[in-house]
Amino acid sequence: MSRTGITVVLALALSSCARAPAFSVIAFYTGKEDAAHISFLHEAEQWFPKVAAKNNFRFDTTSNWGNLNAGFLARYDVVVFLDTRPEDPAQRAAFQAYMEHGGAWMGFHFSGFALTPSVYPANWDWYHNTFLGAGSYVSNTWRPTAAVLRVEDPAHPATRHLPHTFTSSPSEWYRWENDLRQNRDIDILLAIDSTSFPLGTGPKPQEIWHSGYYPVVWTNRNYRMIYFNFGHNDIDYEHKIDSTNRTLSYTLGNPVQDRLIIDALLWLGDKEAHSDRRASR
């Protein structure tokens, strides 16, 4: 083969390598519970592929929770729960095994929800208490409103490009059964800053928070994972505009909050970065 031919082959090989995704992400969703969660899901389905193209990773979605099995998960480096959690025992076992053997996970808002009695009862102890650490849902603010979020761990790869405080996109915010500050495995990355209070507009008094400590983003040091409490858009439930349950606010498109999600995903996709951080503890 001529030198020119070799050069062409090498160039093509290098070009192919450059286009190879750095890691692969699979996002699971249900898309059936609450118009606000479905609105966020539709956002995510448009936003994540654009982010993936810009940051050289692969992003796929599925609403088939039957894919939560060892064979399917082996194709992916990161799993995302966009709205709900798995309910089938075999799917739960497969997800736990995936995480305990080095898999990575990102969860949004309702994926952390558990309440007995409800359609999503507190019946998965490993996930809600060991993995997430938060236990059951206790209460929430209403309506979805923006909050001032404060960075609690500025050294984490997901937060190191963020200002000390910033204003989030509107969301419904959860209060949890467990105090995450008392859990040594949990690294709280962001919490609601006191300048947010009063947070929520009601109309019920308990839906407006006036004080307290509320984590909204955290990781578990024993796993490659991150949880975001946001992911609930404001909806025209009262049909003041029209009869379509129109979306009144969006989770994505906030530059600072977007940076948090992107950096968190790049961190999850980088196994070496995670290993280095655990080794430095």
Predicted ranges, named:
Residues 85-164:
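A glycine-rich, often tryptophan-bearing local segment used as a flexible ligand/cofactor-contacting loop or short
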Residues 24-115:
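Helical hinge/lid and interdomain linker segments adjacent to catalytic or ligand-binding clefts
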Residues 140-227:
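Catalytic beta-strand/loop cores that center a nucleophilic Ser/Cys/Thr
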Residues 18-23, 27, 39, 47-50, ...:
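Extracellular ligand-binding/catalytic regions of CAZymes and related secreted enzymes
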Residues 5-15:
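Bacterial N-terminal signal peptides
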Residues 32-33, 86, 112-114, 193-197, ...:
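Short, solvent-exposed loop/turn segments at secondary-structure junctions
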